[in-house]
């Protein structure tokens, strides 16, 4: 096989683009083959569609191959995640623009006969919202208000087809960076774009790349992609690796050209087998085409990419722990300095960014820094992907411009809270993030605005909670996760999180006191100030944000000693006449004026007015107030 040249690559791109255009003369059926839809049965839908087409004499083509009668042929592809996970399995048909939701294998015959052959829309398979049918994907509210940059090809292409990626402009940004720009120019373009790391910290990517580039005395440098997505409920990076793996590879290759690195590592948790498979397929195909390896396109630049599977430890999402794991050491954070850009993997200068950050890079190089700056806010350019989960009508993968509000994401895109329930909170940023309230719904979602609220974007997990959620239980869940995932290296995190979890357990069991709330705050201050790594330093954010924003939930446990949400039963407060001395202290402390009576006579609680805040229970010096359970 002859070596690929720049001219050869351009010819490859031209041929692929022409093949893509020819393929569009026939129907293209895209079946979601992301992890979520596969679990819902999309592979059986794929197989049944092919069988039904074959039985009717339709020619099903693979890849971009196309010839013959367009009316008797079509392409059926397995794509990456479409994002609309609540409605999977999903089938998208182009050029009709039709999307079918919750498709079952037994629906395939009707799809072939009525839509693929008859051009008719099957209304029962379309998405419905508020009594309205939405046959076309672009009209569905979930998609209509998104701005897809990183996810543009996820769900729109065959994730394992290199030719299709190249046909849509893939690897042209790498070609441009390789031949038309030097390392300083690439770093400057990334800096000018305002791209900040999408893994949680929001550190400017261009500045990080430039720091590594300046180590000109060091012949060995590394590019590391963090695909160790450990936040509960997060699946943004997984979906990108599954749905558009070549964009991640291309971003890493451009980073290599910018900094002089020749080796790249993608660190992926072993719980993502489909992502690992598709990344490996992408690496193998890129290498076979001459896009990876030695002396790429005759430029003199060499680059190799390897996949390293992690064991799923949350702490390995921290940079120094991740590099230690790749080196074969136990995944534990290291004291800084030195920073990763100076002494990272095997002690060499290392660029470490996450999957979404690298996936943004090809678009920035091709379209320019000004284009990217035009999206988002002044301090947070571009878009951000979010995994929308919890008590929301439409869970799924969402991409919006930085600065979009929580209201737009949860209500306009996500469809709001199901079953007529009220919104209570949203947890953002995973175990290192915080819980926000209804009053925060109109805050812009960007790095700086969230920092002011004591929260972080993190990798992009959004867990929505309704009125039936006890926020103390939420705090306990995240503290249990963090304590269980603590590497144990530093005492503040190892022991401090254990003490916080014990305190939360005591509160949840209605055995706590107001002093426990002070204890939580004191422990949080100590852990935050003294923990070794960023994960430990932010471990208390879920607890502190719930204590600050939902203190009433804590008071139900430590004052009232009863939480109607946790106990699952209704209850009413009652004053025991045999114990009441008629001092009136309970009435004076009641914020709702729900308690009445005469001095030195038993008082009475009006449970229609009572909000069960526990103020009376805490004020009564005689223990005369009791909670009566009601079935």
Regions found by a protein language model. Name each.
Residues 3-27, 43-76, 87-89, 94-127, ...:
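Ferredoxin-type iron-sulfur electron-transfer modules in oxidoreductases and energy-metabolism complexes
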Residues 126-192, 353-368:
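Flexible inter-domain linker/hinge segments
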Residues 276-402, 414:
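Hydrophobic alpha-helical positions that pack around
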Residues 175-219, 373-374, 379, 387, ...:
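Accessory "access/gating" subregions that flank catalytic or transport cores
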Residues 157-172, 225-237, 340-345, 387-392, ...:
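Gly-rich Lys/Arg/Thr-decorated short loops/hinges at beta-loop-alpha junctions or inter-strand turns
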Residues 53, 251-253, 402-418:
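Short amphipathic, charge-patterned alpha-helical segments
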Residues 33-41, 86, 190-212, 255, ...:
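Conserved phosphate/anionic-ligand binding catalytic regions in large, soluble enzymes, centered on
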Residues 380-394, 400, 406, 566-611, ...:
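C-terminal accessory/binding modules appended to enzymatic or scaffolding proteins
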């Amino acid at each position: 096989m002859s070596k690929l040249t720049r001219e050869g690559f351009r010819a490859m791109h031209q041929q692929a683009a022409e093949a893509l255009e020819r393929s569009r003369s026939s129907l293209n059926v895209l079946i979601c083959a992301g992890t979520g839809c596969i679990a819902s049965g999309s592979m059986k839908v794929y197989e049944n569609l092919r069988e039904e087409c074959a039985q009717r004499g339709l020619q099903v083509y693979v890849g971009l191959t196309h010839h013959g009668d367009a009316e008797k042929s079509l392409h059926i592809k397995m794509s990456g995640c479409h994002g609309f996970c609540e409605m999977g399995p999903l089938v998208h048909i182009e050029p009709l623009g039709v999307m079918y939701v919750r498709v079952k294998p037994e629906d395939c015959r009707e799809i072939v006969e009525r839509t693929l052959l008859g051009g008719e829309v099957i209304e029962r398979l379309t998405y419905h919202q508020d009594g309205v049918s939405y046959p076309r994907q672009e009209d569905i509210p979930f998609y209509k208000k998104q701005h897809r940059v990183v996810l543009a090809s996820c769900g729109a292409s065959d994730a394992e087809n290199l030719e299709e990626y190249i046909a849509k402009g893939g690897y042209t940004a790498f070609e441009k960076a390789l031949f038309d720009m030097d390392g300083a120019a690439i770093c400057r373009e990334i800096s000018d774009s305002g791209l900040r790391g999408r893994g949680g910290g929001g550190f400017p990517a261009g500045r990080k790349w430039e720091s590594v580039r300046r180590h000109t005395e060091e012949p060995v440098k590394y590019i590391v992609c963090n695909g160790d997505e450990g936040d509960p409920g997060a699946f943004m990076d997984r979906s990108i690796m599954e749905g558009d793996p070549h964009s991640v590879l291309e971003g890493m290759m451009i980073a290599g050209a910018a900094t002089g690195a020749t080796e790249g590592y993608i660190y992926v948790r072993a719980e993502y087998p489909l992502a690992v498979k598709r990344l490996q397929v992408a690496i193998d195909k890129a290498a076979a085409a001459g896009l990876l390896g030695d002396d790429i396109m005759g430029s003199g630049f060499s680059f190799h990419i390897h996949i390293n599977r992690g064991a799923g430890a949350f702490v390995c999402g921290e940079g120094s722990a991740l590099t230690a794991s790749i080196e074969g050491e136990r995944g534990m954070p290291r004291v800084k300095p030195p920073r990763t850009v100076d002494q990272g993997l095997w002690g060499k200068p290392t660029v470490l960014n996450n999957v979404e950050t690298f996936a943004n890079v090809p678009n920035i190089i091709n379209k320019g820094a000004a284009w990217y700056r035009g999206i988002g806010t002044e301090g947070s350019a571009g878009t951000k992907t979010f995994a929308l989960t919890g008590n929301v009508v439409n869970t799924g993968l969402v991409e919006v411009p930085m600065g979009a509000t929580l209201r737009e994401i949860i209500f306009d895109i996500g469809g709001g809270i199901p079953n007529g329930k009220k919104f209570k909170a949203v947890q953002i940023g995973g175990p290192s993030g915080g819980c926000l309230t209804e009053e925060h719904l109109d805050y812009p979602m960007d790095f700086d605005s969230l920092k002011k609220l004591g929260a972080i974007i993190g990798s992009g997990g959004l867990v929505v909670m309704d009125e039936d959620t006890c926020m103390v239980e939420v705090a306990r869940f995240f503290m249990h996760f963090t304590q269980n995932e603590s590497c144990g290296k530093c005492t503040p995190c190892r022991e401090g999180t254990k003490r916080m979890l014990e305190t939360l357990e005591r509160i949840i069991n209605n055995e706590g006191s107001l002093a426990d709330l002070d204890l939580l705050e004191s422990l949080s201050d100590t852990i935050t100030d003294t923990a070794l790594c960023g994960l430990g330093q932010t471990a208390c954010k879920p607890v502190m944000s719930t204590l600050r924003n939902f203190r009433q939930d804590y008071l139900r446990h430590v004052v009232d000693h009863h939480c109607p949400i946790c106990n699952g039963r209704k209850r009413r407060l009652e004053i025991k006449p045999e114990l009441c001395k008629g001092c009136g202290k309970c009435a004076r402390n009641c914020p709702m004026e729900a308690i009445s009576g005469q001095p030195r006579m038993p008082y009475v609680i009006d449970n229609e007015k009572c909000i069960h805040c526990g103020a009376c229970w805490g004020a009564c010096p005689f223990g005369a107030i009791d909670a009566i359970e009601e079935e």
